[in-house]
């Protein structure tokens, strides 16, 4: 059995930070409905599993089309935290993110994952592979696993939007 890859400590820290940035953008782009930017976070050959918005093995275009169609009429909040990261090579890594999401449909739809509800709060993990190409880290494989789903009842109070909505180009404007 080959010895595990041992990255340079500085490259490890820089790579881990870059990977965290990619995942933060993933959550923000989904929640602020920036579908045109979402696809840029993935390698062209990325594959997806465990998602209600794309079939297993879907490619990037199918995933973006599915998630934009499915989550377009929602208020969604995605949080990823407490990552575990293992560098598997100079330009590859495996990561597990603890995750929590809240999805509420605003168009009267009910949800197949939690029948008879207008949304859900979910808990689980993302299992992902990342690859650095041309100096840029991107997601090469994404799997969502679920530990728990709690329904948002149809008769739950109507959502109230925050006082100030997100600036979709806050970072990009500098």
Regions found by a protein language model. Give the residues of each.
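Generic alpha-helical secondary structure signal
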Residues: 30-33, 52, 67, 130, ...
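A beta-strand edge to alpha-helix "cap/lid" segment located at domain peripheries
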Residues: 2-7, 72-79, 86-174
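A solvent-exposed, acidic/Ser-Thr-rich amphipathic alpha-helical stretch
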Residues: 35-106
């Amino acid at each position: 059995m080959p010895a595990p890859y041992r990255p340079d400590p500085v490259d490890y820290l820089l790579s881990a930070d870059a990977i965290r940035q990619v995942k933060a953008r993933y959550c923000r782009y989904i929640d602020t409905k920036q579908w045109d930017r979402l696809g840029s976070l993935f390698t062209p050959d990325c594959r997806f599993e465990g998602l209600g918005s794309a079939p297993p093995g879907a490619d990037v275009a199918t995933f973006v089309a599915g998630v934009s169609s499915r989550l377009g009429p929602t208020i969604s909040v995605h949080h990823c935290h407490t990552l575990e990261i293992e560098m598997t090579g100079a330009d590859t890594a495996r990561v597990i993110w603890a995750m929590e999401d809240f999805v509420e449909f605003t168009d009267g739809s009910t949800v197949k994952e939690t029948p008879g509800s207008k949304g859900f709060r979910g808990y689980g993990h993302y299992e992902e592979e990342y690859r650095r190409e041309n100096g840029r880290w991107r997601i090469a494989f994404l799997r969502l696993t679920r530990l728990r789903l709690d329904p948002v009842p149809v008769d739950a109070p109507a959502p109230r939007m925050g006082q100030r909505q997100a600036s979709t180009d806050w970072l990009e404007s500098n």
